């Protein structure tokens, strides 16, 4: 086993990478509130795992979406647990994101030279809220349907571009299969991809600039 490790160490310098990760200086003022971002990341990873598991059973059609969710909850092995964890971690992710944003703002973590870190963090907060909006509709029950109808109808108040924007969100003039397909695609592909991209921007900047000092 040691020979295998030595082979990789010689080529990749694994120990140097491990030392860099584990030996980063942590300021003495850091407390549990500085862990909120990490908790948010953990919730996101739980969301990815449980959401991926549910895609094996969920059917994104207006006629089968609700029944497929019912199947997950009552028939699929541990389906009730997976979906429950998905819902709980979704709520936890939103809460932790809000608290994280407040913590960063109140401790001045958005100031120079961390402006870009703040901007990417705000984008991640918007993406988190978007996860909630799109995911809420996927069971396609009464609550989900009317939530989608209200949310997608909000832009209609915008002059000139309001109606075309509503039709773009819904996929047609009214809420239906096109709307569910769009929201499912956003929730399972577009938003996770964008979140991963902005996380890959956010974390290296934190790593490079370190944790902001006390007020």
Swiss-Prot record:
The keyword Heme applies. It comes from the Eukaryota. Gene3D superfamilies: Cytochrome Bc1 Complex, Chain C. Its cofactor is heme b; heme c. The chain crosses the membrane at residues 32-52, 90-110, 116-136, 186-206. Heme c binds at residue 35. Keywords: Chloroplast, Electron transport, Heme, Iron, Membrane, Metal-binding, Photosynthesis, Plastid, Thylakoid, Transmembrane, Transmembrane helix, Transport. Heme b 1 binds at residues 100, 202. Heme b 2 binds at residues 86, 187. GO terms for biological process: photosynthesis; respiratory electron transport chain. It is found in: Plastid, Chloroplast thylakoid membrane. GO terms for cellular component: chloroplast thylakoid membrane; membrane. GO terms for molecular function: electron transporter, transferring electrons within cytochrome b6/f complex of photosystem II activity; metal ion binding; oxidoreductase activity. Pfam families: Cytochrome_B. It is a multi-pass membrane protein. NCBIfam families: PRK03735.1. HAMAP family: Cytb6_f_cytb6 (MF_00633). Heme 1 (or BH or b566) is high-potential and absorbs at about 566 nm, and heme 2 (or BL or b562) is low-potential and absorbs at about 562 nm. The 4 large subunits of the cytochrome b6-f complex are cytochrome b6, subunit IV (17 kDa polypeptide, PetD), cytochrome f and the Rieske protein, while the 4 small subunits are PetG, PetL, PetM and PetN. The complex functions as a dimer. This is Cytochrome b6.
């Amino acid at each position: 086993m040691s020979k295998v490790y030595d082979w990789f160490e010689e080529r990749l310098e694994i120990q140097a990478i491990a030392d860099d990760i584990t030996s980063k200086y942590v300021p003495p003022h850091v407390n549990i509130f500085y862990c909120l971002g990490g908790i948010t990341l953990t919730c996101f990873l739980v969301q990815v795992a449980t959401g991926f598991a549910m895609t094996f059973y969920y059917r994104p059609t207006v006629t089968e979406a609700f029944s497929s969710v019912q199947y997950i909850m009552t028939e699929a092995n541990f389906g009730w647990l997976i979906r429950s964890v998905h819902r709980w971690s979704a709520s936890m992710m939103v809460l932790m994101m809000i608290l994280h944003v407040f913590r960063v703002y109140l401790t001045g973590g958005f100031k120079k030279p961390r402006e870009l870190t703040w901007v990417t963090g705000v984008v991640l907060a918007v993406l988190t809220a978007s996860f909630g909006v799109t995911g809420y509709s996927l069971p396609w029950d009464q609550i989900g349907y009317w939530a989608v109808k209200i949310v997608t109808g909000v832009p209609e108040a915008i002059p000139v571009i309001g109606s075309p924007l509503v039709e773009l969100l819904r996929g047609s003039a009214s809420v239906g299969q096109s709307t569910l397909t769009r929201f499912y695609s956003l929730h399972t592909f577009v938003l996770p991809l964008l979140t991963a991209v902005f996380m890959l921007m956010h974390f290296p900047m934190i790593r490079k600039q370190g944790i902001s000092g006390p007020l």
